[in-house]
């Protein structure tokens, strides 16, 4: 499939005015988007290892949901060799491959219609701690995805990555202050103004603010690496029992918030604790495979922000990252207990983690709307 013409004319209304809202991830999905990894200054061996891992993730998702892969023209032939045949390749320019953060948030209404929210994007901080420059192609990704599906587009006046929000589909939005209130995202806006915009564009009513995300998360603490909804009234929190670990105070503070809050429906939350893998660190061999560029350096000995919470719910499957042989089986068992009606599929995902994220970060679901 070739690059679709981008519709430059956004709607002048807001989703909440039009009766549209962001559904929960467990709502039925018509597709999942991914983007081809190729940056040599972020992915070792010019992305070769990551590409093989992305193919395994796409294969795991494809058993439940159609997969679209955005690929720059120069890499289409290579992607055809690597990707499973069921993956639909779409010619698309991008600066990197984080579909969760550069793709649209698709909102739905009660009639089953879909539209998309196109957020502002500045590569996780712009010139104040951002992860690479330029990001001009990434700014066009959401429009291209929406055009591919023929969805109308809302243009939101807010710098926001999809990985920084989770919703329960019933009026609750969960996020982190470390990211959304960071001075390198929307310094001109107050917390209240940000909440108002999220009400407008997600059609949510209540917010659960955790202070911090996962230790050493270079996105400034995205919620999707730290905590997510399992179903209405239930959340899953990244956890360690080791009080000497720098992650412990972050997870403990989050637990305190979650234990003392209610969702938009007035429910107290049931909290599941998902164990932390590792700790995990970048090796010398892994760091040497990354070339110098505008991306953040990958340094040997640097702690990686590994988390099993960074999984994707897609129709009848949970696709989660396998990160540590010592804890992978424990994580899989815990996820099966939380999601007894789902098929739990693990994919070895260290190569994604080395680039700064994981399975949830590299995917963006398109709800069915039905």
From Swiss-Prot:
Q: Provide the GO biological process annotations.
A: putrescine biosynthetic process
Extent of the signal sequence: none
Q: What class of enzyme is it?
A: hydrolase
Q: Which family does it belong to?
A: Belongs to the agmatine deiminase family.
Active-site residues from the entry: 361 (amidino-cysteine intermediate)
**SUPFAM superfamilies assigned:** Pentein
| Annotated protein name in UniProt | Putative agmatine deiminase
Keywords linked to the UniProt accession:
Hydrolase
Q: Which organism is it from?
A: Shewanella baltica (strain OS155 / ATCC BAA-1091)
Q: Which Pfam families match?
A: PAD_porph
Q: Which GO terms describe its molecular function?
A: agmatine deiminase activity; protein-arginine deiminase activity
Which catalysed reactions does the entry list for this protein?
Answer: agmatine + H2O = N-carbamoylputrescine + NH4(+)
* Positions of disulphide bridges: none
Q: Which domain of life is it from?
A: Bacteria
What NCBIfam families does the entry give?
agmatine_aguA, PRK13551.1
- Documented EC number(s): 3.5.3.12
């Amino acid at each position: 499939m070739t690059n679709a013409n981008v519709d430059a004319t956004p709607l002048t209304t807001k989703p909440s005015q039009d009766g549209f809202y962001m559904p929960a991830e467990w709502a039925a999905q018509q597709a999942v988007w991914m983007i081809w990894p190729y940056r040599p200054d972020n992915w070792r061996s010019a992305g070769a290892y990551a590409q093989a891992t992305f193919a395994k993730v796409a294969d795991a998702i494809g058993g439940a949901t159609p997969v679209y892969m955005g690929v720059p023209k120069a890499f289409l032939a290579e992607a055809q060799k690597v990707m499973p045949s069921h993956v639909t390749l779409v010619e698309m320019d991008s600066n990197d491959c984080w579909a969760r953060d550069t793709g649209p948030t698709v909102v739905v209404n009660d009639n089953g219609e879909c539209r998309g929210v196109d957020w502002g994007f500045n590569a996780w901080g712009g010139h104040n701690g951002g992860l690479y420059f330029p990001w001009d192609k990434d700014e066009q990704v959401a429009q291209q995805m929406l055009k591919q599906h023929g969805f109308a587009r809302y243009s939101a006046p807010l710098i926001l990555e999809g990985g920084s929000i989770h919703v329960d589909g019933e009026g609750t939005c969960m996020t982190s202050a470390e990211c959304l209130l960071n001075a390198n995202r929307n310094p001109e806006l107050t917390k209240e103004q940000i909440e108002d915009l999220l009400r407008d564009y997600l059609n949510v009513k209540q917010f659960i603010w955790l202070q911090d995300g996962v230790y050493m998360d270079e996105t400034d603490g995205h919620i999707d690496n730290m905590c997510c909804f399992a179903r209405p009234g239930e959340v899953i929190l990244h956890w360690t029992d080791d009080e000497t670990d720098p992650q412990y105070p972050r997870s403990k503070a989050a637990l305190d918030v979650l234990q003392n809050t209610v969702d938009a429906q007035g429910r107290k939350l049931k909290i599941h604790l998902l164990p932390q893998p590792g700790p995990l660190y970048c090796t010398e061999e892994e760091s040497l495979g990354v070339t110098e560029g505008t991306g953040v350096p990958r340094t040997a000995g640097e702690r990686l922000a590994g988390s099993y919470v960074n999984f994707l719910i897609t129709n009848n499957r949970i696709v989660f990252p396998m990160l540590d042989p010592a804890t992978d089986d424990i994580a899989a068992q815990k996820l099966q207990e939380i999601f007894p009606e789902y098929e739990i599929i693990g994919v070895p995902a260290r190569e994604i983690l080395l680039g700064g994220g994981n399975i949830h970060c590299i995917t963006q679901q398109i709800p069915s709307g039905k």
